[in-house]
Design a protein with these regions (language model features):
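Metal-dependent catalytic neighborhoods of phosphoester/phosphodiester hydrolases
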Residues: 1-13, 36-39
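Short, basic/aromatic-enriched C-terminal tail that caps enzymatic domains
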Residues: 184-208
């Protein structure tokens, strides 16, 4: 793991590309950012050329040595887009439900409608990816969008995608698949609101 080779500043080439590509859509993802001589695994979201959300990965993957070269974030992130409230997370964050619940409940009057996970999750542990995405959707009564890479990395570690969209009740709007693809998925807020009104168990959730 060598962020020195790939990290950019916030005015770097990839960040500028994301800004340019967002003129008529929202574009988001994570990349290695260098800031004040520190490295962050940072999620960025752009719309109409402007940065609308920024989140630094909270949980660093110590098994792979990420904690030795990256700085952990310490701030939750929630933002709005076209009437939806969204909360972004990066990869390994998926395994830590307390952090996600803390994000969801930071404003009890406006819990996130969509949880976004961008990931570099290997094939060897893909069953955990599938199960945890469903769990995060069900326990937080939210849509969950999980976007994962595909192909082999420089160490030969295989990644088989399984990008998916999970409903608040655990059903799929987009089932996991093992190919490169562009997916068009429509999510609607009214069924989510009705579901939360009918089963308001978030009001009984533990605070953190």
């Amino acid at each position: 793991m060598n962020p020195e080779k790939v990290a950019e500043t916030m005015d770097g080439e990839t960040v500028q590309w994301m800004s340019q590509m967002s003129q008529d859509r929202m574009i988001c993802g994570s990349l290695s950012i260098r800031e004040n001589d520190l490295f962050f695994n940072r999620f960025l979201a752009f719309y109409q050329g402007k940065l609308v959300a920024q989140y630094d990965k909270r949980h660093l993957f110590s098994y792979g040595g990420e904690h030795e070269v990256y700085q952990a974030g310490n701030q939750t992130c929630v933002f709005t887009f076209q009437g939806f409230t969204l909360a972004p997370f990066v990869c390994y964050d998926l395994r830590f439900p307390a952090w996600i619940r803390k994000t969801v409940l930071r404003d009890e009057l406006d819990c996130p409608d969509v949880l976004l996970f961008v990931a570099n999750w290997p094939s060897a542990r893909i069953s955990a990816w599938d199960v945890l995405l469903k769990a995060r959707a069900i326990e937080n009564q939210a849509f969950v969008i999980g976007v994962n890479r595909i192909g082999n990395d420089e160490k030969g570690i295989a990644h088989n995608g399984h990008t998916q969209v999970v409903k608040y009740d655990g059903g799929y709007l987009l089932e996991p698949h093992q190919r490169e693809a562009i997916a068009h998925v429509v999510i609607e807020k009214s069924p989510l609101s009705q579901f939360r009104d009918r089963f308001p168990f978030l009001s009984d959730a533990d605070g953190f």
